[in-house]
Regions:
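Short intrinsically disordered terminal tails
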Residues: 1, 121-123
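Active-site nucleophile-adjacent alpha helix/oxyanion-hole segment immediately C-terminal to the catalytic cysteine
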Residues: 1-49
């Protein structure tokens, strides 16, 4: 099941990258609007109609608007969280301090860029 979850994350990352150009032309006013639209469109198999994550997967979100960065943190059954960093057109996924998805090959360790972020838990 863990491999399936990681595969889902990679599919989500690919979907975000592929949809970026389309959404840029779609008239969305802000970066945050565009990001949340993509995440909603690409994660229907993870998130139920009520907005909560299914299958015991907890989804946390932090948006750092001033830096135009969005960090998504997925906690999977007590394992080390997977941190997905979106910066403009660059998307990176890190787990256990190792990059597991980096399409442009530009990040040695994205953890060092995340100096602080607040985790907001769905209730």
């Amino acid at each position: 099941m863990k491999k399936n979850f990681q595969r889902t994350l990679l599919d989500l990352a690919n979907g975000i990258c592929l949809l970026d150009c389309y959404l840029t032309l779609g008239g969305y006013e802000t970066f945050e609007d565009k990001m949340f639209y993509v995440l909603k469109a690409q994660s229907k198999h993870l998130v139920g109609d009520d907005g909560y994550v299914n299958d015991a997967n907890r989804l946390f979100t932090e948006v750092l608007g001033k830096n135009k960065k969005v960090y998504k943190t997925y906690e999977y059954h007590g394992d080390e969280p997977v941190i997905a960093c979106w910066e403009g057109k660059h998307f990176t996924i890190v787990q256990n301090g190792k990059v597991i998805y980096d399409p442009l090959g530009e990040r040695e360790n994205p953890y060092k860029e995340i100096t602080s972020y607040r985790v907001v838990e769905d209730k």
